[in-house]
């Protein structure tokens, strides 16, 4: 997507931008969605997602299923295809209850946000959600204003990459130990 763009979605479980792949184990079917200029995304439905990358999240799961505590989500085949979503500039705003600003769902789901203002404003909404996938955030701002609306929910082996100031490194290490998650600095 080139140029200044505006994306709005208003339904439950909707996604502003979606990069999705479902593997067959027989051939690589990578998907890639990239914005090169300012793109503004607004979602207003419950359980909606601003940007979603999904790569075979499990045979019993769909791409829009919530990040939950279910462990048995494996595939009977090797996941070989990637779902990539890269956003350069702009904003993501979610207004619906239990929504995610950016969601990487599946072992080969990758989201890269650079110069993006990410904001969730409803109760139970997470700025970032990861289930086995990877999200890399650089030069961006993250805000959550709803009740029970943490910055990130990461489950089942996901990774979040973002630059950290020394001031927050100890708090993040403590959080990692408490929740057994991986938060890594960019390469």
Regions flagged by a language model, labelled:
Residues 1-48, 52-124, 129-148, 153-172, ...:
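Surface-exposed loop/turn motifs in large extracellular/passenger domains
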């Amino acid at each position: 997507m080139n140029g200044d763009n505006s994306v709005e979605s208003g339904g439950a479980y909707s996604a502003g931008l979606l990069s999705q792949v479902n593997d067959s184990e027989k051939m690589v079917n990578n998907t890639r969605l990239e914005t090169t200029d300012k793109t503004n995304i607004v979602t207003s439905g419950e359980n909606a997602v601003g940007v979603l990358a999904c790569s075979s999240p499990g045979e019993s799961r769909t791409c829009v299923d919530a990040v939950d505590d279910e462990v048995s989500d494996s595939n009977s085949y090797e996941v070989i295809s990637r779902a990539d979503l890269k956003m350069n500039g702009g904003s993501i705003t979610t207004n619906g209850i239990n929504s995610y600003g950016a969601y990487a769902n599946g072992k080969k789901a990758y989201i890269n946000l650079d110069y993006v203002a990410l904001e969730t404003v409803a109760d139970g909404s997470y700025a970032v959600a990861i289930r086995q996938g990877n999200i890399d955030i650089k030069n961006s701002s993250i805000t959550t204003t709803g009740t029970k609306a943490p910055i990130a929910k990461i489950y089942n082996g996901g990774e979040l990459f973002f630059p950290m100031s020394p001031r927050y490194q100890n708090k993040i290490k403590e959080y990692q130990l408490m929740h057994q998650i991986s938060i890594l600095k960019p390469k």
